[in-house]
UniProtKB/Swiss-Prot annotation:
Keywords: Ribonucleoprotein, Ribosomal protein, RNA-binding, rRNA-binding. Belongs to the universal ribosomal protein uS19 family. One of its GO terms (cellular component) is ribonucleoprotein complex. The lineage of its organism: Bacteria, Pseudomonadati, Pseudomonadota, Gammaproteobacteria, Enterobacterales. GO terms for molecular function: rRNA binding; structural constituent of ribosome. This is Small ribosomal subunit protein uS19. Protein S19 forms a complex with S13 that binds strongly to the 16S ribosomal RNA. GO terms for biological process: translation. Gene3D superfamilies: 30s Ribosomal Protein S19, Chain A (3.30.860.10).
Amino acid sequence: MPRSLKKGPFIDLHLLKKVEKAVESGDKKPIR
């Protein structure tokens, strides 16, 4: 869920990398 645009998006770098990997592999598992 995105935060308010005023505050800007909050995504941890390690979490972002996990998301990118999941998207690349088409993985549908929940990302922890």
